Amino acid sequence: MHPLIHDWNTTDTPRPATVLLDDETLRDGLQSPSVRCPTIDEKLEILHLIDRLGIETADLGLPGAGPHVVRDVERLAREIADERLRVEANCAARTMIADIRPIAEISQRAGLPIECCTFIGSSPLRQYAEGWTLDQLLRLTEEAVTFAIGEGLRVMYVTEDTTRADPDTLRALYATAIRAGATRVCISDTVGHATPHGAAAVVRFIASVVDECGGGVGIDWHGHRDRDFAIINTLAALEAGATRLHGSAIGIGERVGNTPMELLLVNLVLMGYLDRDLSALVEYCETVSAATHVPIPVNYPVVGRDAFRTATGVHAAAVIKAFKKNDLALVDAVYSGVPAGLIGREQQIDVGPMSGKSNVVFWLERHGYAATDDLVDRIFSKAKASSTVLTSDEIVAEVRATGSG
């Protein structure tokens, strides 16, 4: 952060002792109704980018969905083992032995430890809709966790719709899973119901249940974007005691998606909770976008085309003055809350109807053209008459028309 910034975000909140990340792009991310399922080669490329970003675990898929998922999950698991990637693997499974067994078999064939993320609905809404009783849920929980442990799998026990479930049900379910051997539990805001206050409250409650069971069990947070609270809820969950946070590239996932991993990473770094090289972040997002056919909006934070781009005269003038001071940190701070350099990008000055002449001069000089008065006036007049920002080709055409190119 630039030394001239007074950071009102600084608080007395203790820095979290543990901040781990779990990437859901290749599982929950692909449950979006609009995505194209990537090829195995594309999945491998995404896996390597997850590893380059230092993300601790990646959900490789739900093998219980069928042979095609088993095939891809095993190939991904072998890639981690053969290439000695740092990222650890987990897989989703319903609380059914039929879902858990293929995970154990893949783990054994690939020679790679795989965490089993076995999930079950928990809210009264889901119980009523499905015709379940709590006794049934407890029995399924105990059987599933016990079987997975017996097969040599580490278990994260996941309750769906945790943020709309009652305390007594949650206590019973989590206590059963922990007694059966689960080493992590996951709180899921499955339909994006939670507010930051609610996210923190449910995490603190589950932490108390973990303590009642003897402690030593990690807490995950899995958020969704339905009310557009995913990032702030995830940060609230972290500060309340969650130690592993879930997300997916460009927020893809069920309905409107999951917590966007790239935005979570940027915020964790800017808050001082992580020290991480984010130079692969743009490639990570663009690769997932291309593989899934989910476009990145131009105004998407951090990785969108317009994230560090301005054609407004006042804004551009301040950035240009910072450039002239040869202070790149100032350039990245004067009109940006996220330093472009953090992710390997830079500030971009364009020319449009809201621009001043300094935009034109700066653009020309940055592109190796002499900013003569006649040329500047010509481009400036064209920009003022335009309804959009001028393209590079339009500006170069004006340069050539004056014989300056």
Name each model-derived stretch.
Residues 15, 21, 32-57, 73-84, ...:
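Alpha/beta enzyme core
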Residues 51-56, 82, 242-246, 261-269, ...:
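Short acidic (Asp/Glu) and glycine-rich catalytic loops that position anionic groups and cofactors
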Residues 191-196, 200-326:
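Catalytic alpha/beta core domains of metabolic enzymes, predominantly
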Residues 1-27, 274-405:
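A mid-to-C-terminal "edge-of-domain" accessory segment
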Residues 1-16, 61-67, 102, 197-200, ...:
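N-terminal glycine-rich phosphate/pyrophosphate-binding loops that anchor nucleotide-derived ligands
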Residues 38-41, 45, 67-71, 98, ...:
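Conserved active-site and cofactor/substrate-binding residues in soluble primary-metabolism enzymes
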